[in-house]
UniProtKB/Swiss-Prot annotation:
Keywords: Fatty acid biosynthesis, Fatty acid metabolism, Isopeptide bond, Lipid biosynthesis, Lipid metabolism, Magnesium, Metal-binding, Multifunctional enzyme, NAD, NADP, Oxidoreductase, Phosphopantetheine, Phosphoprotein, Transferase, Ubl conjugation. InterPro entries: 4-PPantetheinyl_Trfase_dom, 4-PPantetheinyl_Trfase_dom_sf, ACPS, Acyl_Trfase/lysoPLipase, Fas_alpha_ACP, FAS_alpha_su_C, FAS_alpha_yeast, FASI_helical. Residues 98-108 have a biased composition (Basic and acidic residues). This is Fatty acid synthase subunit alpha. It comes from the Eukaryota. GO terms for biological process: long-chain fatty acid biosynthetic process. Present with 17000 molecules/cell in log phase SD medium. NCBIfam families: pantethn_trn. The gene is FAS2.
Length: 1887
């Protein structure tokens, strides 16, 4: 047959086949059999877009004809036009053609073996070359890029994955995972690259798709790939490294032709660097690695090319090394000369001096050398330590002011109150008395009211602790009233202590401070000091000795003068009487202690400390002063000296008496320092100065204290001192200061005296205590160095300079009558110890001031008081000597504690001593007799040596004994006694709320609450979570409440931040299960996590300097902006792709030239004069700090896939994690479990955001403008509702309401409000609420422009660290601190929560939002939220009865009785209705009508509960929404314990919010003295905008369930302006209370958004349900907690906390049916174990009519069938809640013992009693006898249950008698009940 005939027949056949297929039924199986079997066709070709029929034919061949073809040796081909064009047209492969041409190219002779030998050396040097050229690599055969590689790269690039992770066997649809937008992007890119695409390419495997493209692919890169490569080169390569350069390098380095270059560049595209490469070398290295990858993909060997290139390069290098340097110089000499001449000519033309810079440089060099020489000289002369030491550190801006004693007084009281209640303080000891004194020192009217409220509301019946706190409180109130107008005093009641050194049997030396036996208080201490000791006794004769000498002299004189015997006798008698008198006289008895008028000598404090507190305000009158007890012959341990004419300072009894009497008064009655202005230096922690500072503040002084180590820790220390001791009127100002700096000394004094207007204090000093010093140890004369000189400068020179500056300031202001008393720190160490540098000289030199006071002109401005400070234990200088202090005291010397020495020094500030100083300088010896110890240094050395020797001997004996013991008893003899250290293990808990015993709940909640509320209208929080700067809600709470992480907190944070991961398997060859370090893979034990990672955790969590890696490289120090510039001259050309070049031309027109580069196909672009450029510039922005999520936080850690992470905005990831954790906190491990209880339409999402996906917005605007790669569907990620959409798509699959609030900073509270409204409206039963917002540079910059945020640079200038830059409510607050994160709560109906058994963290009693007034400022704070306290008062005398819960309960009971009657009537009426229905339909009728009656009864009851329980206050102008919300649960406005403030740390907000809360409380009649405790969470977290209210809500729930109220630890000083708000307390430390009933959360957002929510403790919900229901709920929660705990820990271990859903809980077929059946519920699939909807359960009758309904209908049906013409029927309905099973009298009166036993054993005791009671009532009604009244007992009617038989009736007593009289022979009864009611029907039969 001719070919043309065959072709024509084939055409006809094809046409007929197609016509047959279109026109006839498909009979493809038969058709296949015809051409495969009948005709044995070997080549089948399908004409179509995809191999559909071909695929079927292949399957048919495999299944049916495989053995058939093998038998006949048939080889068949199944081809498709769309993919097998080459095979169909027999097109040869290009590689085959190349292979045929190859032999022709191999005509050149093969290289001989000799070619490998080295070439002979050249006879002469080669010509000099400029550089060694890079040798070209051996070229590799070219091959165009294949479509498969191009397709592979384009898909991988779009999916942001590596080539290895994109299998070519998968389809595009599979790879995108359902992301339609990404799929569309890929298809668009493919169309742009390859032109046309086959039909449905997304469903074709990539390898098949590549083959399809290859047929029409030219091998050249298309538009898309060229554009991507151009972008890669321009954005990631270094400047000048163009695509031409890249191609040239690939050609020369690797010998790759253009096609191969395309392949390498494509591979590079799929491995794009994260950031621009820094240098050309980096770019080449990158290309090298890409070339190797390409070679491995296509199977090319690059080694030969590389070796050829390397060898040639080496040869070139060798040639270059042989160049003659001299010849090169000779050649280039003339060029250099010519260039220099041209340069000089141009300079002369431009009138420039080329040597001017050189001359200036030489001059500057000489100047620098001279300055350096001076510096070197100063360093050599003064020493490095001295030069560095004098650096200035003072700054006015860093001054910290503490003066809010009014607030700390209340805080101290509350702390004391709760410490006693919690048993921390079990009795009133010295510490409590001291705290009482501090409180009295701060007494004011507000404080007294505060105490009166708390003490009057203390319930003594709760236990001894409450009794103690009430007794102490009442005493303290009286004390404060008495001292209300009295100046504060310094009074120390601590027990004086002494040194105690002990050496145990093992030779360990221990030192401790022990109370002194005979000195129990400071008054006795003063007495001890006055008495002195043997060592201080002077060598003066006693009175007796003097009298004896007088007696002897008179006797001798009498003998000479012959005195009469009578006179002698009289004289002898007189002498004898006088001696007797001296012996018995108490006037000079040194052991006699001070006598107090009206007081016992015995220490009252040791007998009864509560009485001591009561006596504190009483001033003691001293009848006999301590000075009168000073022995004549003894010098007191403390005394004043007077200068003798000889210039010595000697003990002066009179002055000392004055001083000691003053100390005594201070010890008994305290001493005030009110209106004293004091400067003190050297008052660091653990110093004498710090104790002096405490006393000054306690006495009401205003003090400036300096510190040389200014830091947050130091300022916190001083703040804690002020908070504890600061009395009313006192002020503490802390400043950085270097006493070694002259500038600092001058600046400090100027700051103190300068006016407030100029930034100074405007003070005039009354006292200066310059105690600053540095230790000098081991420095003898030959080692005097710069440190000694610097110390001398601190301790002498600059003390004098400081005094001089004060004198200068006083003189300048004309202050002549108010001299400042300078307490000079003298020392008894006048070289006694030695080896202390210039310490002794510094102290001795201060004594010159005593003379200069008289000789110079500053006596009117300064007075001098030298204090010789004795041995003071525990200070920085003396702590090493503590162990020998006891030995020193055995010598008779008195050493001192820091408190004792501070007391001594403060005694020098008493008015008596101050007055002495104004007359003449005073020298106070506070040495304790140390100066009387001879050879002190040798003695102390001896003491130390003895201690060490004793220690060593005992240690040796101990070791010897132990060895002997082991020898005798064996090595394991002590094993049983060995100490075993239990290693802690982390156990992260979910912190489900504690569920108290029901009786305890009923003691908390009012009894009337039970059954009062419609629980479907009570909204509860069942779960909450967050992602924030401190990780999760658990870890944030640890840091907020306790200020540190627990072991569990550290483990969780380390896991969150990626420091550790869990390992279960072999590790280094051994099985290991536990945590490992994520980097090293080394095991990490739980106990080591805190020590190993906590520092890093704290550094990279919370509020900190912005970390650029978290924000796309954003560095506020280099905030990027662009500026438009017009090109003034033509620029150098650069390379670009054709497409880019054309775009430049399109924009700039004739201002740009573009030309093609023929070699590469790229374009040269040249910008001409007049073109416009946008040039980046960097701005130094001043907002450098933010609250950032922990570094290392990764959504993948929680189980979120890379696909989702790459697709969504980061804020969406925060939300997804928060929602999952909130569900886990709810005990819900599978969100589909909700659909077991509710319909899919009843789960809503009301979470929202202030700005939404700001990263997406940034991509849309900034990145897109910069033409950076941005996903095409970025728009969808910017929508604020997208986050909620992802939650639904990945987790919950609900079809309920979705509402997206946008309320700026008030979004979260608005979300709660909307969620509550959504549930109350019936649109949902469960809602996800919360808020979220991100931090990005754009928002940060704009907030900064508004001056709303904290200026970091200013904060640094003020010495603030990032952690303390958010300081709500403080004097220095200066703007809010931005943060990022998400917060979520799960809220639902209380009734549903109880049924599900989920934990209930709190009740949302109220949620509201409000706007403000007319204005022009969007962010201005307002008070619109005050409307939640709106309440009409006018002249209404009595409160609304609706506020009385008993009244409301009474109304509800009445209404319940009506409902009961209605149900009974309706059920009885059913009998008549049923008679009208055909008998075959009666059962159905009764079922439906019974259900309707039940529904209506339930509806009526809920309406009644709603009216009298939930909504009684609504629309009542006399009851504020806030008051009504609390009253719903039996609470009053006084029960609102905590207010969580929005507290942004801005001046305006904190004042406005405080005023708003204060006015609410005041208007609603909150009791005076009962402020709400303010919580300011943002001090820790910063301000996350949309998430703010959610985090506050989480914190409020944690407060409710723990009773712990976190303090605002950044509140170093509360603003004075806030003192006016009496109903708010601002604590700075955490308070552990005995319970919090309710918490308010307020939130304010830009745009007139104000919001408030009230959450109430869940105990008040439990009080509203029955005990049975509560116990059932407790069991459910317990089970749920266990499963949630297991799920959570497995999730952490395996990184599976987030488990995304792949499918909805219903099939596509059931989707519409599920939506349309509100009673559709999921059930567990037996095969898969998953929760799904089953078609059997949709529109099922069982889901509407339950078993109880069937039972009730059956009873009614039986009733209708009974023939009761001679009998009676009784129907009774009882609400379950109406039976009070707690009333024992009611139970025993109406139920028999058997009935009680039966009912009590049932799962629902109350329901069983209700059913039994209902049966009794029904029986009575069926008897038809006369009632004995509503109060008649029904015990005579007994309902008997035998086994599981139906209940029977037995009548007794009066009931039996009445039945017999009525002729009743039998009674039958039926009972049914559900959660709402019990129904009983009784039928009686008569004779």
């Amino acid at each position: 047959m001719k070919p043309e005939v065959e072709q024509e027949l084939a055409h006809i056949l094809l046409t007929e086949l197609l016509a047959y297929q279109f026109a006839s039924p498909v009979r493809w199986i038969e058709t296949q059999d015809v051409f495969l079997k009948d005709f044995n066709t070997e080549r089948v070709v399908e004409i179509g877009p995809s191999p559909t029929l071909a695929g079927m034919a292949q399957r048919t061949l495999k299944n049916k004809y495989e053995s058939y073809d093998a038998a006949l040796s048939l080889h068949r081909e199944i081809l498709c036009y769309s993919k097998d064009a080459k095979e169909i047209y027999y097109t040869p492969d290009p590689s085959e053609l190349a292979a045929k041409e190859e032999p022709a190219k191999e005509e050149a002779p093969a290289p001989t073996p000799a070619a490998s030998a080295p070439a002979p050396a050249a006879a002469a040097p080669a010509p000099v070359a400029a550089a060694a050229p890079a040798a070209a690599a051996a070229e590799i055969a070219d091959e165009p890029v294949k479509a498969s590689l191009l397709l592979h790269v384009l898909v991988a690039h779009k999916l942001k994955k590596s080539l290895d992770s994109i299998p070519m066997s998968k389809t595009i649809k599979d790879l995108v995972g359902g992301k339609s937008t990404v799929q569309n992007e890929i298809l668009g890119d493919l169309g742009k690259e390859f032109g046309t695409t086959p039909e449905k390419p997304e469903e074709t495997p990539l390898e098949e798709l590549a083959e399809t493209f290859q047929d029409t692919f030219s091998g050249a890169l298309g538009k898309q790939s060229s554009s991507l490569l151009s972008r890669l080169i321009s954005s990631k390569m270094p400047g000048g490294f163009t695509i031409t350069v890249a191609r040239k390098y690939l050609q020369t380095r690797w010998g790759l032709p253009s096609g191969r270059q395309d392949g390498v560049l494509l591979v590079a595209l799929s491995n794009e660097p994260a950031a621009r490469l820094g240098s050309e070398a980096d770019a080449k290295a990158f290309l090298d690695s890409m070339a190797q990858k390409y070679a491995s993909i296509v199977g090319v060997d690059l080694s030969s090319a590389a070796s050829a290139s390397g060898a040639a390069g080496a040869g070139a290098a060798a040639g270059a090394a042989m160049i003659d340097a001299g010849a090169l110089e000779e050649i280039t000499k003339d060029h250099k000369v010519l260039a220099r001449q041209q340069l000089q000519v141009l300079a002369r033309y431009l009138k420039m001096d080329l040597d001017n810079g050189e001359r200036k440089f030489l001059k500057e060099k000489d100047t620098v050398a001279e300055l350096q020489a001076q510096l070197d000289y100063l360093n050599a002369e003064l020493g490095e330590f001295f030069v560095n030491g004098v650096a200035t550190s003072f700054s006015r801006k860093k001054a910290r002011t503490f003066d809010s004693s009014w607030n700390w007084a209340k805080q101290s009281l509350l702390s004391l109150y709760f410490e006693i209640i919690h048993g921390v303080l079990k009795n009133v000891d010295r510490e409590v008395v001291s705290e009482a004194i501090n409180i009295m020192n701060r007494s004011n009217d507000a404080l007294i009211k505060f105490m009166e409220y708390h003490i009057s509301n203390t319930d003594e019946t709760k236990g001894e602790n409450y009794q103690l706190v009430k007794t102490l409180g009442e005493q303290l109130i009286e004390n404060c009233k008495q001292v209300l107008d009295v100046d504060p005093v310094y009074k120390d009641v601590a027990k004086p202590t002494g040194p105690k050194t002990a050496i145990d049997k093992n030779g360990n030396i221990t030192y401790s401070e022990e109370p002194r036996e005979k000195v129990r208080k400071l008054s006795q201490y003063v007495q001890e000091m006055a008495l002195g000791g043997p060592i201080t006794k002077e060598s003066q004769p006693t009175i007796e000795e003097d009298l004896t000498r007088v007696y002897k002299a008179i006797s001798a004189q009498a003998d000479k003068q012959d005195i009469s015997s009578s006179t002698r006798v009289e004289f002898e008698k007189l002498y004898s009487d006088l001696m007797k008198f001296l012996e018995s006289s108490k006037e000079i008895d040194p052991s006699q202690t001070t006598q107090l008028a009206g007081m016992d000598v015995e220490d009252a404090l040791d007998k009864d400390s509560t009485k001591e507190v009561a006596s504190l305000p009483n001033k003691s009158t001293i009848s006999k002063t301590v000075s009168s007890t000073i022995p004549r012959e003894t010098i007191p341990f403390l005394h004043l000296r007077k200068k003798t004419p000889a210039g010595d300072w000697k003990y002066d009894r009179q002055l000392s008496s004055l001083f000691l009497d003053g100390l005594e008064k201070a010890a008994f009655n305290g001493v005030t320092f009110k209106d004293k202005y004091v400067l003190i230096t050297g008052a660091g922690k653990g110093s004498i100065g710090a104790e002096v500072l405490q006393g000054l503040l306690q006495g009401g002084a205003k003090v400036v204290v300096t510190t040389s180590r200014f830091s947050k820790q130091v300022t916190d220390y001083y703040q804690s001192i002020y908070a504890k001791y600061g009395a009313k009127g006192s002020t503490l100002i802390v400043v950085p200061f270097n006493q070694g700096s002259k500038q600092d000394v001058e600046a400090l004094i100027e700051f103190i005296y300068d006016t407030e207007k100029n930034g100074g204090l405007g003070w005039d000093l009354d006292a200066i205590i310059p105690f600053a010093a540095i230790p000098e140890q081991g420095i003898e004369l030959e080692h005097i160095d710069s440190k000694s000189e610097f110390a001398h400068r601190i301790m002498l020179t600059n003390i004098l300079r400081m005094m001089g500056c004060v004198k200068k300031q006083k003189s300048a202001r004309g202050i002549e009558t108010r001299p400042a008393q300078v307490i000079l720190p003298m020392s008894p160490n006048h070289g006694t110890f030695g080896g202390d540098g210039m310490y002794s000289e510094s102290k001795l030199s201060l004594e010159t001031l005593f003379n200069r006071w008289h000789s110079e002109s500053w006596a009117n401005q300064l007075t001098v008081c030298g204090a010789i400070i004795g041995w003071t234990r525990g200070t920085g200088l003396m702590s090493a000597n503590n162990i020998i202090a006891e030995g020193i005291e055995k010598m008779g010397v008195r050493t001192f504690s820091q408190k004792e020495m501070a007391f001594n020094l403060l005694g020098l500030l008493t008015p008596e001593v101050v007055e002495l100083c104004q007359k003449s300088p005073v020298m106070a010896d506070l040495n304790g007799g140390l100066q009387f110890v001879p050879e002190l240094k040798e003695f102390t050395a001896k003491l130390r040596k003895e201690l060490v020797e004793t220690s060593e001997v005992r240690k040796a004996v101990s070791i010897e004994t132990a060895l002997e013991h082991k020898v005798v008893n064996g090595n394991s003899a002590d094993a049983a006694y060995a100490q075993v250290e239990i290693q802690p293990r982390a156990n992260i808990q979910l912190d489900f709320p504690e569920l108290k015993p029901y009786k305890q709940v009923k003691q908390i909640a009012p009894a009337e609450l039970e059954g009062l509320l419609d629980l479907e209208r009570v909204i509860v929080v069942t779960g909450f979570a967050e992602v924030g700067p401190w990780g999760s809600a658990r870890t944030r709470w640890e840091m907020e409440a306790f200020g540190e992480f627990s072991l569990e907190g550290c483990v969780e944070m380390a896991w969150i931040m990626g420091f550790i991961s869990y390992h279960n398997g072999n590790l280094k060859g051994r099985p290991y299960t536990g945590w490992v370090d994520s980097k090293t893979k080394e095991p990490v034990d739980d106990k080591d996590v805190k020590a190993k990672y906590e520092t890093s955790i704290l550094e990279h969590s919370g509020i900190r300097l912005i970390e650029p890696e978290l924000f796309n490289g954003y560095n506020p120090e280099k905030k990027e902006m662009i500026q438009e510039v017009i090109v003034e001259e033509d620029l150098e050309p650069f390379e670009a792709s054709k497409e880019t070049a054309e775009q430049f031309k399109h924009q700039h027109g004739d201002k740009v030239d573009i030309f093609e580069i023929p070699e590469t196909g790229e374009y040269s672009v040249k910008l001409l004069k007049g073109a416009t450029l946008y040039i980046p510039k960097a701005l130094r922005f001043d907002r450098l700090v933010a609250g950032q999520i922990p570094t290392g936080w990764n959504a993948k850690t929680y189980g979120i896939s890379d696909d989702i992470i790459s697709q969504v905005d980061p804020i969406t990831l925060f939300v997804l994690v928060s929602v999952v954790e909130a569900f886990i906190a709810s005990g819900i491990t599978d969100p589909y479990e909700m659909y077991k209880y509710v319909h899919v339409s009843e789960v809503g999402n009301c979470s929202g955001s202030g700005m939404g996906g700001v990263s997406a917005l940034r991509g849309m605007f900034k990145d897109r403008f910069k033409d950076e790669p941005v996903q095409n569907d970025i728009l969808q990620e910017s929508f604020i509702n997208t986050m909620s959409a992802w939650v639904n798509m990945l987790l919950i699959s609900s079809s309920g309401p979705i509402k997206t609030p946008v309320g700026a900073c008030a979004t979260s509270v608005e979300s709660v409000d909307i969620g509550v409204e959504t549930i109350l409206s019936g649109k949902a039963r469960i809602c996800i609420v919360g808020g979220y917002d991100d931090f990005q540079e754009e928002g940060s910059f704009e907030f900064g422009n508004m001056k709303a945020t904290s200026n970091t640079l200013e904060e640094f200038e003020h010495g603030r660290t990032p952690a303390e830059m958010s300081r709500p409510a403080t004097t220095t607050r200066n703007g809010f601190m931005e943060a990022q994160g998400a917060g979520i709560q799960i809220i639902m109906q209380a009734d549903l929560a109880l049924k599900m058994g989920v934990p209930i963290y709190g009740i949302v009693a109220m949620a509201a939002t409000a706007t403000d007034k007319i204005g022009r400022s969007v962010p201005a704070p307002g008070k619109g939220i005050l409307t939640t306290a709106r309440e009409h008062h006018s002249s209404v005398k009595y409160a609304s009865p609706n506020l009385n819960m008993k009244y409301r309960k009474r109304q509800l009971v009445t209404r319940e009785a009506q409902i009961k009657d209605w149900v009974e009537n309706e059920l009885e009426a059913l009998k008549l209705e049923a008679e009208e229905i055909p008998s075959e339909d009666q059962n159905e009728f009764l079922l439906e009508r019974t259900r309707e009656i039940h529904n209506e009864a339930e509806s009526q009851l809920r309406a009644a509960q709603q009216q009298w329980g939930n909504d009684f206050y609504k629309r009542d102008p006399r009851i504020a929404p806030l008051r009504g919300a609390l009253a719903t649960y039996g609470l009053t406005i006084d029960d609102l314990g905590v207010a969580s403030f929005h507290g942004t740390s801005t001046k305006a907000n904190d004042k406005n919010e405080s005023a708003t809360i204060n006015e609410m409380m005041k208007h609603l009649g909150r009791s005076e003295g009962n402020p709400v405790i303010g919580v300011f969470q943002k001090f820790l977290t910063g301000h996350p905008k949309g998430a703010a209210g959610a985090w506050m809500m989480n914190g409020a729930l944690q407060i409710l369930n723990s009773g712990i109220i976190p303090g605002n630890r950044n509140a170093d000083n509360v603003d004075k302006i806030l003192e006016q708000f009496e109903y708010v307390l601002y604590p700075s430390k955490t308070l552990k209370t005995d319970g919090v009933r309710a918490v308010s959360i307020t939130s304010f957002g830009f745009g007139q958004k104000g919001g408030q929510a009230i959450v109430v403790h869940p105990d008040y919900l439990y009080g509203a349900i029955t005990e049975d229901r509560y116990n059932e709920y407790v069991a459910k929660v317990s089970a749920r907690e266990k499963s949630a705990y297991k799920f959570f820990h497995n999730g952490m271990i395996y990184n599976k906390l987030f488990v995304s859903k792949e499918h909805a809980p219903y099939t596509d077929e059931l989707e519409e049916d599920v939506y349309l059946d509100p009673l559709a519920r999921v059930s567990k699939d037996k095969k898969s174990g998953s929760l799904t909807f089953n078609s059997k359960n949709i529109q099922s009758k069982d889901s509407y009519i339950n078993a109880n309904t069937i039972e009730t209908a059956k009873m009614i049906e039986n009733m209708t069938k009974e023939k009761v013409s001679n009998g009676g029927v009784g129907v009774d309905v009882e609400l379950i809640t109406s039976i009070n099973v707690e009333n024992d009298t009611f139970i025993e009166r109406n139920f028999t013992p058997q009935e009680i036993e039966y009912c009590s054993a049932q799962p629902s005791v109350q329901s069983s009693f209700a059913g039994t009671w209902s049966a009794k009532e029904a029986v009575f009604k069926s008897l038809g006898v006369k009632s004995l009244g509503g109060g008649a007992a029904l015990k005579d009617i007994e309902i008997v249950r035998v086994n599981k038989n139906a209940p029977a009736v037995e009548l007794h007593g009066n009931a039996k008698k009445a039945a017999e009289e009525a002729g009743v022979t039998d009674v039958k009864v039926s009972i049914s009940h559900d959660d709402l009611q019990a129904v009983a029907v009784a039928v009686s039969t008569k004779k």
